[in-house]
């Protein structure tokens, strides 16, 4: 059933109809469309378009339809309706007859779809926030269980300074906390109702839009009808949050892919999140993590695509805006799936402490400690930096770690070096000295874990 047609003397070409129809993807707004229609029916009572009895009849029919949709959503795609709005209205008319044709009074598909999409976004943000916090909790739990797992930290993929696996986990907790904050901020801005703005100029009926917004669970109603029907900032904001969030998950995946290699050997992934090779029997591939990393690109593409769709649109509504949904649906679905999958990866991960410790003791990760030791003895840092660089070259030449160089050899580089240098060069000392807020010392890591646990509840 088309919601328009009186103006036309020819039927739409079937090829155009298929090109124009959006039911194949906006069917996902069915529940929101029905909920919005119930609220609109109540508003029509307040302006005398519907009687209380008519509204009750419509609400009952819409409630039955809502249950039908939840029980068998695939029925929607069996229809040739243009979009979800015409499908819902057609089903309503089937149930209540001519009364169903009164429901659209004073309403446009422009404010209707804007409302539906915002309601869907609110529901989906709630799911994303839950999944985000679940992953944060999984990371905090993994950190708590691995506070003593010393491993190399990297810059430029070169061993830099010793850290702990717990500290690594907590770095991603911080990223996810920012993602959570971005979602909460976006939610505040999208929590305004456009329903009652009509096609672009507002509705001709004196409907209390603030009351209507409250019925739908919005914090308030929008203030400008022209902006309301053409606003898709909430789509851009959520796509941006998803793009940033997926970058974080991609980096998380890349780190663990590297940690899982035979060359690093810091972790072993569970069989539940890995796959084998059709040719090589020995293979255990980190497919879950590789897919998280790979799916990042499609989310970035959705954001870029939506930016380009909106950049040249005049006010108010244009059919281009139909392109807002597929990318948004896919991007947020992808982000949600990847959050769940990242948590599943952590659920069965094994941290190989001996190998982590061995790697942390290699690569002269304690060189900075020797420089700090010299500074404490009164040597200017730049000079100390140069001295330690020369000492590292000699240690490499001899194939020894710094702490295995005899004192007389170390003193060739600086006479201020004494026997007290050796405890300073231990891995534990390297960690203990990073005791400022945010550092890798056991005390700071324990405090960070406690803070995250309290925040997450």
UniProtKB/Swiss-Prot annotation:
Pfam families: ASL_C2 (PF14698), Lyase_1 (PF00206). It is found in: Cytoplasm. GO terms for biological process: arginine biosynthetic process via ornithine; L-arginine biosynthetic process. Its main location: cytoplasm. It comes from the Bacteria. Pathway: Amino-acid biosynthesis; L-arginine biosynthesis; L-arginine from L-ornithine and carbamoyl phosphate: step 3/3. GO terms for molecular function: argininosuccinate lyase activity. Its EC number is 4.3.2.1. Transmembrane segments: none annotated. Keywords: Amino-acid biosynthesis, Arginine biosynthesis, Cytoplasm, Lyase. The keyword Cytoplasm applies. PROSITE patterns: FUMARATE_LYASES (PS00163). GO terms for cellular component: cytosol. The keyword Mitochondrion does not apply. It is an enzyme of class 4 (lyase). It catalyses: 2-(N(omega)-L-arginino)succinate = fumarate + L-arginine. PANTHER family: ARGININOSUCCINATE LYASE (PTHR43814:SF1). Belongs to the lyase 1 family. Argininosuccinate lyase subfamily. This is Argininosuccinate lyase. It comes from Shigella sonnei (strain Ss046). The gene is argH.
């Amino acid at each position: 059933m088309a919601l328009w047609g009186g103006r036309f003397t020819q039927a739409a070409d079937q090829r155009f109809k298929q090109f124009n129809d959006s039911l194949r993807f906006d069917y996902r707004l069915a529940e929101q469309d029905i909920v919005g229609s119930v609220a609109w029916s109540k508003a029509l009572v307040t302006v005398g378009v519907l009687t209380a009895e008519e509204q009750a009849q419509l609400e009952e029919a819409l409630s039955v339809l809502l249950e039908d949709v939840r029980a068998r959503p695939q029925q929607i795609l069996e229809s040739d309706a243009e979009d979800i709005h015409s499908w819902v209205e057609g089903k309503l008319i089937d149930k209540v007859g001519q009364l169903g044709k009164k429901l659209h009074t004073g309403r446009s598909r422009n404010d209707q779809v804007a409302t539906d999409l915002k309601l869907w976004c609110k529901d989906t943000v709630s799911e994303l926030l839950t999944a985000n916090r679940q992953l944060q909790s999984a990371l905090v739990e993994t950190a708590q269980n691995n506070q003593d797992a010393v491993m190399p930290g990297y810059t430029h993929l070169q061993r830099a300074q010793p850290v702990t696996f717990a500290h690594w986990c907590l770095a991603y907790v911080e990223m996810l906390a920012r993602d959570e904050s971005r979602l909460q901020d976006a939610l505040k801005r999208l929590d305004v109702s456009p329903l009652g703005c009509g096609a672009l100029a507002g509705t001709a009926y004196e409907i209390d839009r603030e009351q209507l917004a409250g019925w739908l669970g919005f914090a308030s109603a929008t203030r400008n009808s022209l902006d309301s029907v053409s606003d898709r900032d909430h789509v851009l904001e959520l796509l941006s949050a998803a793009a940033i969030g997926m970058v974080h998950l991609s980096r998380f995946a890349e780190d663990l892919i590297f940690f899982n290699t035979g060359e690093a050997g810091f972790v072993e992934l569970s069989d539940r999140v890995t796959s084998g090779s059709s040719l090589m029997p020995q293979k255990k591939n980190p497919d879950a993590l590789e897919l998280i990393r790979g799916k990042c690109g499609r989310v970035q593409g959705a954001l870029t695509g939506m930016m380009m769709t909106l950049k040249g649109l005049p006010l108010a509504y244009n059919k281009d805006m139909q392109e807002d949904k597929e990318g948004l649906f896919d991007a947020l679905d992808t982000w949600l799936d990847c959050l769940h999958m990242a948590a599943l990866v952590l659920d069965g991960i094994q941290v190989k402490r001996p190998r982590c410790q061995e790697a942390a003791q290699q690569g002269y990760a304690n060189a900075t400690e020797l420089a700090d030791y010299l500074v404490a003895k009164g040597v200017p840092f730049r000079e100390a930096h140069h001295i330690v660089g020369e000492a590292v070259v000699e240690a490499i030449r001899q194939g020894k770690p710094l702490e295995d160089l005899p004192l007389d050899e170390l003193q060739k580089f600086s006479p201020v070096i004494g026997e007290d240098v050796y405890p300073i060069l231990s891995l534990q000392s390297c960690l203990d000295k990073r005791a400022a807020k945010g550092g890798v010392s056991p005390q700071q890591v324990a405090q960070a874990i406690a803070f995250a646990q309290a925040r997450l509840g």
